[in-house]
Amino acid sequence: MQDQEEERMITNQPKEEDLILENGLRPKFLVDYIGQNSVKERLKIFIEAAKQRQEPLDHVLLYGPPGLGKTTLANIIANEMNVNIKITSGPAIERPGDLAAILTNLAANDVLFIDEIHRLNRTVEEVLYPAMEDFALDIIIGKGPSARSIRLDLSQFTLIGATTRAGQLSSPLRDRFGVICKLELYNNKQLTAIVKRSARILDAYIDDEGATEIASRSRGTPRIANRLLRRVRDYAQVKSDGRITKRVAEEALILLEVDSLGLDNTDKKMIETMIYNFNGGPVGLDTLAATTGEERNTIEDVYEPYLLQMGFINRTPRGRIVMQKAYEHFNIPSAE
């Protein structure tokens, strides 16, 4: 099922092409970053205060669904602070020694960005506690009764952690972040602005209606908006005169099997499973995962945020239920 998810045009998980091309489309400073206004305003104040005191920014936790700009914000913070950034991920730091090597190579006030920080193993996480709190590493020398601990001072730094699953962070780790920001799904106006900005960078002509059409099918996610823009640009180049209008965008997105709300056949399968197998719910997450063949985390991180925002499903203490709006969109008669 992982391969199936990677093939989806509207997945919010990064594809290899996204990772290559996103760097060119990413804004470099807060003034160019579209959306997340509350988060931006807070970060602007905290960054300016840290610069005035000539101190590192307090540790930052960014959380929310994939594709909303957590990595972009981390790079922007480093740029605004005029410091270097080291980028890694929770799964990549397998041993305490791996983390120690990274920390000891940071210069004063540098940013360490750990994506998927909820996937750090516990032994690595415990090394991080004194590093975050005291800018120090506690190293154990020797074994058994003769073992002793020495403390190694580190340069002051800012840790930025990113996660799609803030609830999986341990309390000791979460409590050490001084700045915690939740990123929300984008509205169509914000996504339209992102599509138009990206089109300018890609040197692609797009009119307002064409940009709005792509934005409306992007599931509230900039990563998806930029991916759809690139595919619509391909279609416009081969099947039209290269100009992205509403008509061209509609034709391209029909070909890509992305409907007017940004839903595809996988979303339809998820909704139909809940309706036909479980009478519209409630259905437990584990049961839904087993029935659809999708992983539990994939359902929670990839499908649910947008379906919830659209009012197609609802979460209850007893499980997920399908809402009337989903029946209407997919032309399925609702149960009497």
Curated annotation (Swiss-Prot):
**Which key words tag this protein in UniProt?**
ATP-binding, Cytoplasm, DNA damage, DNA recombination, DNA repair, DNA-binding, Hydrolase, Nucleotide-binding
Renumbered residue ranges of the record's region Large ATPase domain (RuvB-L): 2-186
Q: Where does Mg(2+) bind?
A: 71
Q: Which reaction does it catalyse?
A: ATP + H2O = ADP + phosphate + H(+)
Documented EC number(s): 3.6.4.-
Q: Tell me a Gene Ontology molecular-function term this record carries.
A: ATP binding
* Region (Small ATPAse domain (RuvB-S)) location: 187-257
> Region entry Head domain (RuvB-H): which residue ranges?
260-336
Question: Which enzyme class?
Answer: hydrolase
Q: Name one GO cellular component term.
A: cytoplasm
List where in the cell it is found.
Cytoplasm
Q: Which residue stretches, if any, does this entry annotate as coiled coil?
A: none
Q: What is known of its domains?
A: Has 3 domains, the large (RuvB-L) and small ATPase (RuvB-S) domains and the C-terminal head (RuvB-H) domain. The head domain binds DNA, while the ATPase domains jointly bind ATP, ADP or are empty depending on the state of the subunit in the translocation cycle. During a single DNA translocation step the structure of each domain remains the same, but their relative positions change.
What is the recorded function of this protein according to its Swiss-Prot or TrEMBL entry? The RuvA-RuvB-RuvC complex processes Holliday junction (HJ) DNA during genetic recombination and DNA repair, while the RuvA-RuvB complex plays an important role in the rescue of blocked DNA replication forks via replication fork reversal (RFR). RuvA specifically binds to HJ cruciform DNA, conferring on it an open structure. The RuvB hexamer acts as an ATP-dependent pump, pulling dsDNA into and through the RuvAB complex. RuvB forms 2 homohexamers on either side of HJ DNA bound by 1 or 2 RuvA tetramers; 4 subunits per hexamer contact DNA at a time.
* Name under which the protein is recorded: Holliday junction branch migration complex subunit RuvB
The organism of origin for this protein: Alkaliphilus metalliredigens (strain QYMF)
